[in-house]
């Protein structure tokens, strides 16, 4: 669905055409087809897309095995960085903002194909529920626990002050649903990233 800003007809048509060009260009990259949709008027522009598809082999979250490594295809941090930017755009330098945009525009198709070639048992995307929720689901489904080391290498931006101060919508719910299932050995300054909602986040492999 497309949320089109309240405007005159010609301007509304411009937004419609502009949005659809962008949506179609991304769909083509992932060998997808836009088959239906609707639009409505709103105070702010917005795009919501629902993806449907078929699969040749079913992969569940219960197939993890002891001793396997955990891999993230991209760094984390879109949630709190966008929250900081919308609060005050000057909190992010132009370089940091462009870096954020580059990662948000980077798809997961290629890494997904690589994952399949290595016969990865589990591949799931880190979404608005955050890393902790997705990893916890895998552990519970597989009857295992996981150990991860939080360091700045998993962050898009290593400004710890911003990470500690800003939280996007969804952080509170993510924390309340997952925090009691996680044990943090030390008071790690990066722990908020576990519950940070991701937009076009990485694959957890």
Segments from the language model and where they lie:
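Internal active-site segments that recognize and position negatively charged phosphoryl groups
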Residues: 70, 108-111, 116-122, 127-130
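Conserved S/T- and glycine-rich ATP-binding loop of Class I adenylate-forming
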Residues: 67, 125, 205
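Short pre-catalytic strand/loop immediately N-terminal to key active-site residues, enriched for Gly-Thr
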Residues: 95-103, 121-122, 190-193
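Glycine-/charge-enriched secondary-structure boundary and capping motifs
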Residues: 10-33, 40-45, 52, 117-119, ...
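Glycine-rich anion-binding loops of enzyme active sites
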Residues: 1-91
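Glycine- and other small-residue-rich loops at beta-strand/loop junctions that grip anionic moieties
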Residues: 62, 73, 100-104, 124-127, ...
